[in-house]
């Protein structure tokens, strides 16, 4: 009995101090550093509680009301709430909330709509696409005939005429619109016109901008697309996971079958419960304000960096992210990411269109505002952050080495700690 009592009551700090210590260190990092990775965000306490709940104990293969296990009546409530809230949030008729990740949601669409060897079109990785949009190192690029489209070299904007021409030539079965590092508004209507002309399905991967769509800061892909996929973290501010949305009942059945039993077994019910919580939060009026502030902050950061002597790919941003071309500062993405990290500013190196550097080096970094906006940062803070970034990069240019400029980085680090200290997170932890 004593062993059972300990199993159910002994806290993590006692059971596994190594993991507890790692979590505590990560909490400290998140509290004290500025998070600018565009695909990351900060979830609410309510989302954390749902994801860390006893729903993790339950197996629930199948869908609500049609499970292959007994005892699912309460996890069914959670999944039904997630589905209904997702449908309301994006104004659609069908939602599958079971995909465990963004890659799996996209794979499910491929499984439902394509056969190995079929042709599809997607944004080239070097132009801001995603691995699952046809990269040769990804399953999507190995199993299918991929025709990539990209941006123009002169302005780094999507070349829609070239997309149309390529579609007419290659007759894809599926066209994917959406990306991970494109900072401008997507013309869903034009993509649908191209898809209709060649008899293709239009799939929109809005993983990065779903929160902006929900917050009325970016046009919705509906009614133009046949299917939209999105992760549930990033700008949507939920737990890590994926989701598939459509208005077509026949396609919805195919997507459901593709997710289960096609790709996954038992869904992660604790994550689905957390998705439901996040969708509920996104349905509140204050989420509209949040999404608007994300975009305002991105514009403020972008403009500050330009004033500091940096180039922004495509000349600016209309959403939550920007690609920063570092070549004017004589820096690489690899070197800049490391230097900014030492100064407690977290970002990721990222290739820019037509990048002369290798993928592990790059000529750019990608920056995003969702996490900082969640903390409460507004334009004034992002102007300050932009100036700190320029300060680090100018110091790096003077040092001209991987070691960077320790004096400048230490000074900026102190300023970052002062800034983040004014915007506490998870005070109960």
Curated annotation (Swiss-Prot):
Protein location: Cytoplasm
Record keywords: Amino-acid biosynthesis, Cytoplasm, One-carbon metabolism, Pyridoxal phosphate, Transferase
Listed pathway(s): One-carbon metabolism; tetrahydrofolate interconversion; Amino-acid biosynthesis; glycine biosynthesis; glycine from L-serine: step 1/1
Predominant localisation class: cytoplasm
EC number: 2.1.2.1
Single biological process term from Gene Ontology: tetrahydrofolate interconversion
Cofactor(s) for this UniProt protein: pyridoxal 5'-phosphate
Summary of the function given for this chain in its UniProt record: Catalyzes the reversible interconversion of serine and glycine with tetrahydrofolate (THF) serving as the one-carbon carrier. This reaction serves as the major source of one-carbon groups required for the biosynthesis of purines, thymidylate, methionine, and other important biomolecules. Also exhibits THF-independent aldolase activity toward beta-hydroxyamino acids, producing glycine and aldehydes, via a retro-aldol mechanism.
Annotated family: Belongs to the SHMT family.
Designated name of the protein: Serine hydroxymethyltransferase
Organism: Allorhizobium ampelinum (strain ATCC BAA-846 / DSM 112012 / S4)
């Amino acid at each position: 009995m004593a062993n059972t009592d300990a199993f159910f009551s002994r806290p993590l700090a006692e059971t596994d101090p190594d993991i507890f210590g790692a979590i505590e260190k990560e909490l400290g990092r998140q509290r004290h550093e500025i998070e600018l990775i565009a695909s990351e965000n900060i979830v609410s306490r309510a989302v954390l509680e749902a994801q860390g709940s006893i729903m993790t104990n339950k197996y629930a293969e199948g869908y609500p009301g049609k499970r292959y296990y007994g005892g699912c009546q309460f996890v069914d409530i959670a999944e039904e709430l997630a589905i209904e809230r997702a449908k309301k949030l994006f104004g659609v008729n069908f939602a599958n909330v079971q995909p465990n990740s963004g890659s799996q949601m996209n794979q499910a669409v491929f499984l439902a709509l394509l056969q190995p060897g079929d042709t599809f079109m997607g944004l080239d990785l070097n132009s801001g696409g995603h691995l699952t949009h046809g990269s040769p190192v990804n399953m999507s690029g190995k199993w299918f005939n991929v025709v990539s489209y990209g941006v123009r070299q002169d302005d780094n904007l999507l070349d829609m005429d070239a997309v149309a021409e390529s579609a007419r030539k290659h007759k894809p079965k599926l066209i994917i619109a959406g990306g991970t590092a494109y900072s401008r508004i997507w013309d869903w209507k034009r993509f649908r016109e191209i898809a209709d002309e060649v008899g293709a399905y239009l799939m929109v991967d809005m993983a990065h901008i779903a929160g902006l769509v929900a917050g009325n800061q970016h046009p919705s892909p509906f009614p133009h697309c046949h299917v939209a996929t999105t992760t549930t973290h990033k700008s949507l501010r939920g737990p890590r996971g994926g989701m598939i949305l459509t208005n077509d009942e026949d396609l919805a059945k195919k997507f459901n079958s593709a997710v289960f039993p096609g790709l996954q077994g038992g869904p992660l019910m604790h994550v689905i419960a957390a998705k439901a919580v996040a969708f509920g939060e996104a349905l509140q009026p204050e989420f509209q304000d949040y999404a608007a502030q994300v975009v305002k902050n991105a514009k403020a950061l972008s403009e500050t960096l330009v004033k500091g002597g940096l180039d922004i790919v495509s000349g600016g941003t209309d959403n939550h992210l920007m690609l920063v071309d570092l070549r004017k500062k004589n820096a690489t993405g690899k070197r800049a990411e490391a230097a900014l990290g030492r100064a407690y500013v977290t970002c990721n190196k990222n290739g820019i269109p037509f990048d002369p550097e290798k993928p592990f080096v790059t000529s750019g970094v990608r920056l995003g505002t969702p996490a900082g906006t969640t903390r409460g940062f507004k334009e004034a803070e992002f102007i300050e952050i932009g100036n700190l970034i320029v300060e680090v990069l100018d110091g790096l240019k003077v040092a001209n080495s991987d070691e960077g400029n320790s004096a400048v980085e230490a000074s900026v680090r102190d300023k970052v700690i002062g800034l983040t200290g004014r915007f506490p997170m998870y005070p109960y932890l």
